[in-house]
UniProtKB/Swiss-Prot annotation:
Its cofactor is heme. Its main location: periplasm. This is Catalase. It comes from the Bacteria. The active site is at 81, 153. The gene is katB. GO terms for molecular function: catalase activity; heme binding; metal ion binding. Disulfide bonds: none annotated. Pfam families: Catalase, Catalase-rel. Coiled coil: none annotated.
Length: 513
């Protein structure tokens, strides 16, 4: 017999198998597999059948439960911000702004756990992260006062200023409902009626619309919020995250190269960096206006399509992301961010888009994760929750009180007077009308001129190419908007789009700014 075959003798095989099993049992202690009711599973490899050739039995509860749970693994996809990734971290307040806000999260030296969810806005779950899209930058602060959600984007402005246009805007951005294909002409048909979108469209079709990574991306509140101090004094603020990794974007050539290698490049970059201990950081800045300053601008400062040029920024803290999620679905997918999650000292402004988001985001999260979704671990506040809201599907609480109402002497729950909303003076009548100070084009021109020559050329090529396949009337209206913002910008776009420049000039001359 060949000596080399000795290792395959049956006796030696049994010894080897026994030794392997012993080594495994020493290194990994196996847990008992159970069903959802906690009962142990006897066989998870074979269905129970009526004999060797008979049908599968209905009494095989392990098989039935596995299939039932598999059929129900997914929750509704977010209608926007579906494709995302998340991480845990900490925010440390570095400045005393008690003159502006009584929120404990801003007390100098205060350390607050955070969860951040980065996302693409328009495109669906599992879409390539190289696609041109604004990026969500949403932060949940688990503060001593309750949870505060700062739900923003990488762009400092938005496409619209009134929430009543939000469903239409999203529909225009989404694929054609007939073919499920993306179609720029649908978007420009809509935006030809929305001149206030020109600045954010410029951002979208610039290289800022294709960031290289989430780590190398800034974030913005987009909206103004009110900060309220202990004396009830109000200041309007905008929040800005500044990446300490710098900013890096992809040009059109790089987009094609990256997408060919990795359609999850932004998620991979963030997860890999944190796994290696290269923790990304952002400084948080605020811009501040007094209420009386709002009337001093030639545009409406509470218009979400505008930035606040010339208003100094003040650093108030730093955030570090230092832990990846343990389970993507339970944390990143089930996290429920909403601008309505505010704490005393932070209130919404009168921004018309923000006012709609206060309802829409909380409502869509209730639709996605249920009425008790804020009780999920990733959404649960660190502070005590003491509410009379009750029942509903998947209520995992344990209430022992017989008093499910307020006020009550039997089981009193006191209100906190300092948490009342600040009083806001009002005048005028109810109305449905545009804001008075629109100024739709000036900031677009300033943005275009702030870009270097290469970035301008990339922008003109990307946006001009999209306009070239748009219907004629929408194309000329859009070109007139960009020409009104900056003549060089409009001229370059008209050339790429194959348009008559004289006609563009004539339309632009009729526009007011």
């Amino acid at each position: 017999m060949n000596p080399s075959l000795n290792a395959f003798r049956p006796g030696r095989l049994l010894v080897a198998a026994s030794l392997t099993a012993s080594l495994l049992s020493l290194s990994v202690q196996a847990a008992t597999l159970t069903r959802d009711n906690g009962a142990p599973v006897g066989d998870n490899q074979n269905s129970q059948t009526a004999g060797p050739n008979g049908s599968v039995l209905l009494q095989d509860v392990q098989l039935l439960q596995k299939l039932q749970r598999f059929d129900r693994e997914r929750i509704p996809e977010r209608v926007v911000h579906a494709r995302g990734t998340g991480a845990h971290g900490e925010f440390v307040a570095s400045a005393d702004i008690s003159d502006l806000s009584m929120a404990k999260v801003f007390r100098k030296g205060e350390k607050t756990p955070v969860f951040v969810r980065f996302s693409a806005v328009v495109h669906g779950n599992h879409s390539p992260e190289t696609l041109r899209d604004p990026r969500g930058f949403a932060t949940k602060f688990y503060t001593a006062d309750g949870n505060w959600d700062l739900v923003g984007n990488n762009f400092p402005t938005f496409f619209i200023r009134d929430a009543i246009k939000f469903p239409d805007m999203v529909h225009a951005f989404k694929p054609d409902p007939r073919s499920n294909l993306d179609d720029d002409s649908r978007r420009f048909d809509f935006f030809s009626h929305v001149p206030e979108a020109t600045r954010t469209l410029t951002l979208l079709y610039s290289n800022e619309g294709t960031p290289a990574s989430y780590r190398e991306m800034d974030g913005n509140s987009v909206h103004a919020y009110k900060l309220v101090n202990a004396r009830g004094e109000v200041h309007y603020v905008k929040f800005h995250w500044k990446s300490l990794q710098g900013q890096k974007n992809l040009d059109p050539k790089q987009v094609a190269e990256v997408q060919g290698r990795d359609y999850s490049h932004m998620t991979n970059d963030l997860v890999s960096a944190i796994r290696k201990g290269d923790f990304p950081k952002w400084d948080l800045y605020i811009q501040v206006l007094k209420p009386e300053d709002l009337a001093k601008f030639d545009f409406d400062p509470l218009d979400a399509t505008k930035i606040w040029p010339g208003i100094p920024e003040r650093k108030i803290g730093q955030m570090v992301l230092n832990r990846n999620v343990d389970n993507f679905f339970q944390e990143t997918e089930q996290v429920a961010m909403a601008p309505s999650n505010l704490v005393p000292g932070i209130e919404p402004s009168e921004d018309r888009l923000l006012q709609g988001r206060l309802f829409a985001y909380a409502d869509t999260q209730m639709y996605r994760v249920g009425a008790n979704g804020l009780g999920l671990p990733v959404n649960r506040p660190r502070s005590e929750v003491n509410t009379v809201n009750q029942d509903g599907a998947l209520n995992a609480g344990h209430s022992t009180s017989g008093v499910n109402y307020q006020p009550s002497r039997l089981d009193p729950r006191e209100e906190q007077a300092s948490a009342r909303y600040v009083r806001t003076p009002l005048s005028g009548t109810t109305q449905q009308a545009k804001i008075q100070r629109e100024q739709n084009f000036k900031q677009t021109g300033e943005l275009f001129r702030s870009y270097g020559k290469k970035d301008q050329a990339d922008l003109i090529a990307s946006l001009g190419g999209a306009l070239a396949i748009t219907d004629d009337e929408s194309k000329y209206i859009m070109l007139s908007y960009f020409y009104k913002a900056d003549s060089d910008y409009g001229t370059g776009l008209a050339k790429v789009a194959g348009a008559d420049l004289q006609r563009v000039r004539q339309l632009a001359a009729k526009l007011q700014d």
